From Swiss-Prot:
Testis. One of its GO terms (biological process) is cell differentiation. One of its GO terms (molecular function) is DNA binding. GO terms for cellular component: nucleosome; nucleus. This is Protamine. Its main location: nucleus. The keyword Cell membrane does not apply. Keywords: Chromosome, Developmental protein, Differentiation, DNA condensation, DNA-binding, Nucleosome core, Nucleus, Spermatogenesis. It is found in: Nucleus; Chromosome. Protamines substitute for histones in the chromatin of sperm during the haploid phase of spermatogenesis. They compact sperm DNA into a highly condensed, stable and inactive complex. Residues 1-32 are annotated as: Disordered.
Length: 32
């Protein structure tokens, strides 16, 4: 149970972090 809950939680956190990084990188390029 702990391994199954950690797998989806880590995948969702990685996806959210990737989206934030991509948006921050796009804003930085547009501001430059």
């Amino acid at each position: 149970m702990r391994r199954q809950a950690s797998l989806p939680a880590r995948r969702r956190r990685r996806v959210r972090r990737t989206r934030v990084v991509r948006r921050r990188r796009r804003v930085g390029r547009r501001r430059h």
